[in-house]
C-alpha cells in the first residue's frame, strides 16, 4: 500500500465552456490519479453544493478558484500521508472537514475531484483497471446505453418541454453492437429531421434539438428513425424519457408544458405518462414528477411501477437519506446515479448498494456539463449496474465514455455480460 504524498487541483473547462475542477493525486510509489468533475444544468434542490466563485468579472461568476484553493490549502494537508486504498476513511475525513450536510463549505466539486483521483491513483498502484479496483473480480456487466438523441427543456434552445428522449438497444447481443445500433439510429434521425425541414443542431448532450409541434412528435420521429435504421421498436430498441418535471413545476403546484401551452396537475401528469406508455414502447421514465411531489410520485408508482422503470434523479439526488424515504414510501423503482450530486465515491457506492438491496435499479449518469474524464464508464461496470446514461454518440465529452466501455468489453472478452432486457430487474414480469 502507498500513501498520498501530493494533491493538486486546477481550474479547467467543461464541455459548455464553464470552469470546473480537476485534481491530481500522487502516491509515494509514483502512481498518479487524475479526475475532472462534471456539472449539471437542471440540478435538483437537494444536490450537494457545487462551489462557484461568484466573481462576475471572471467567467461570468462561474469560476472555481475557491474550490481549487480548498483542495490545495485545506483538503491536501489533511489527506497527505493517508493510505490511498483507504477510500472510505479518506472520503469520511473530507466530509468531516467540510462539516456541512451538503458540502457547501469546501464544495462537492472540490471533494469529488479528490475522491475520484484518489481511487484512480490507488487502482494504478494496484495494477488494476479502475472498474476492477472498484468492483473486484465480479465486475463484468457492460451497460445498456440509455442514449439521449433528442433534447428539449434546459438542454436545448427549442420549444420541446421534455428534456430527453432516449433509445435503449435491449436487443443487442453485446455492448459493441448496442453502440452501433444507437449510432445508426442517431444518423437516421438526422436524415428524418432533414427531410422534414427541421433543425439538426445539437443540445448540450449531443442530441438533436429541433422545434416540434408537440412532445409526442419527438417520439414519432425517433420511431421513424429506428425503423429506417432497420430495427424493430419495442423489440430491438425501446424508448426512455426524462421529462425533468421539476423544471416544469411552478408555484401553483402544477406542471407547465410551455412549448405546448398546457398545464397539468399531478394526477393529469400520471394520466399523460400512462397514455404515452400504452401507446409507445417506452420502458423508462425519469423524473416524471417534481422532486417534492411525493404524493404524485406515489400515484405514478402505483399506476406504472410494475410495468416500466421509474427513475428518481432530482427526487433522490444519489442521496441515501432521500432514497431510503422513497423505498419506505414505495416510490419509484430506480435511482439515477450522479457522482457530483453527492460528492464522494463512497457515498455513491452506498446509494447503489441501498438501491440494489431494495430491488431498485441504478442507472449511472453523466451531467450535461462534462469533460473527457471517463470515470463513470468504469464505475458502471465496477458495480454491475447494467445501465448508463451518457448522451448521444456525438461530442467527444460523451463519446469518451462509450469508447472506454468498448475498451473494457474488449479486455473482459468472453466473460463480459450484456443484459439487454434483463437489465430491468425492477419491473415485475
Curated annotation (Swiss-Prot):
List of residues binding (2R)-2-phosphoglycerate: 163, 338, 367-368, 389
Co-factor binding details: Binds a second Mg(2+) ion via substrate during catalysis.
A Pfam family it matches: Enolase_N
UniProt KW keywords: Cytoplasm, Glycolysis, Lyase, Magnesium, Metal-binding, Secreted
CC annotations in GO: cell surface; extracellular region; phosphopyruvate hydratase complex
GO molecular function: magnesium ion binding; phosphopyruvate hydratase activity
Annotated metabolic or biological route of this protein: Carbohydrate degradation; glycolysis; pyruvate from D-glyceraldehyde 3-phosphate: step 4/5
Entry superkingdom: Bacteria
PROSITE patterns the record matches: ENOLASE
Record InterPro entries: Enolase, Enolase-like_C_sf, Enolase-like_N, Enolase_C, Enolase_CS, Enolase_N
Residues at which Mg(2+) binds: 242, 286, 313
Its EC number(s): 4.2.1.11
Cofactor(s), by name: Mg(2+)
Annotated active site: 205 (proton donor), 338 (proton acceptor)
Protein family (similarity comment): Belongs to the enolase family.
Chain's role: Catalyzes the reversible conversion of 2-phosphoglycerate (2-PG) into phosphoenolpyruvate (PEP). It is essential for the degradation of carbohydrates via glycolysis.
Name of this chain's protein: Enolase
Species assigned in the record: Thermoanaerobacter sp. (strain X514)
Amino acid at each position: 500500500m502507498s500513501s498520498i504524498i501530493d494533491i493538486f487541483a486546477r481550474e479547467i473547462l467543461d464541455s459548455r465552456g464553464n470552469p470546473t475542477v480537476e485534481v491530481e493525486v500522487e502516491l509515494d510509489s509514483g502512481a498518479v490519479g487524475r479526475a475532472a468533475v462534471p456539472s449539471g444544468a437542471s440540478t435538483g434542490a437537494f444536490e450537494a453544493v457545487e462551489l462557484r466563485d461568484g466573481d462576475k468579472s471572471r467567467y461570468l461568476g462561474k469560476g472555481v478558484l475557491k474550490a481549487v484553493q480548498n483542495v490545495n490549502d485545506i483538503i491536501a494537508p489533511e489527506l497527505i500521508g493517508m493510505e490511498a486504498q483507504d477510500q472510505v476513511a479518506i472520503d469520511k475525513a473530507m466530509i468531516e472537514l467540510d462539516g456541512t450536510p451538503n458540502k457547501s463549505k469546501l464544495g462537492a466539486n472540490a471533494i469529488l475531484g479528490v475522491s475520484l483521483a484518489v481511487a484512480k491513483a490507488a487502482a494504478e498502484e494496484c495494477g488494476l483497471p479502475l472498474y476492477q479496483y472498484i468492483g473486484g473480480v465480479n465486475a463484468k456487466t457492460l451497460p445498456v446505453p440509455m442514449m439521449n438523441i433528442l433534447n428539449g427543456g434546459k438542454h436545448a434552445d427549442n420549444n420541446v418541454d421534455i428534456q430527453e428522449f432516449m433509445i435503449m438497444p435491449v436487443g443487442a447481443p453485446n455492448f459493441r453492437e448496442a453502440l452501433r445500433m444507437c449510432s445508426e439510429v442517431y444518423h437516421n434521425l438526422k436524415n428524418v429531421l432533414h427531410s422534414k425541414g427541421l433543425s439538426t443542431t445539437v443540445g448540450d448532450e449531443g442530441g438533436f434539438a429541433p422545434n416540434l409541434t408537440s412532445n409526442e412528435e419527438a417520439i414519432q420521429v425517433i420511431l421513424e428513425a429506428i425503423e429506417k435504421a432497420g430495427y424493430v421498436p419495442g423489440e430491438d430498441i425501446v424508448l426512455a424519457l426524462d421529462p425533468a418535471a421539476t423544471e416544469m413545476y411552478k408555484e401553483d403546484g402544477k406542471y407547465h408544458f410551455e412549448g405546448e401551452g398546457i398545464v397539468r396537475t399531478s394526477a393529469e401528469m400520471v394520466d399523460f405518462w400512462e397514455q404515452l406508455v400504452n401507446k409507445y414502447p417506452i420502458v423508462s421514465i425519469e423524473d416524471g414528477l417534481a422532486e417534492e411531489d411525493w404524493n404524485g410520485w406515489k400515484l405514478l408508482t402505483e399506476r406504472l411501477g410494475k410495468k416500466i422503470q421509474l427513475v428518481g434523479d432530482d427526487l433522490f439526488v444519489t442521496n441515501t437519506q432521500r432514497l431510503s424515504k422513497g423505498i419506505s414510501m414505495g416510490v419509484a423503482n430506480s435511482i439515477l446515479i450522479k457522482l457530483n450530486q453527492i460528492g464522494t465515491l463512497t457515498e455513491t457506492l452506498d446509494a447503489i448498494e441501498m438501491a440494489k438491496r431494495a430491488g431498485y435499479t441504478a442507472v449511472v449518469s453523466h451531467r450535461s456539463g462534462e469533460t473527457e474524464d471517463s470515470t463513470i464508464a468504469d464505475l458502471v461496470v465496477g458495480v454491475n449496474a447494467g445501465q448508463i446514461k451518457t448522451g448521444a454518440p456525438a461530442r467527444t465529452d460523451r463519446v469518451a465514455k462509450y469508447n472506454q466501455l468498448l475498451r473494457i468489453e474488449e479486455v473482459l472478452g468472453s466473460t463480459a455480460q450484456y443484459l439487454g432486457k434483463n437489465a430491468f430487474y425492477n419491473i415485475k414480469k
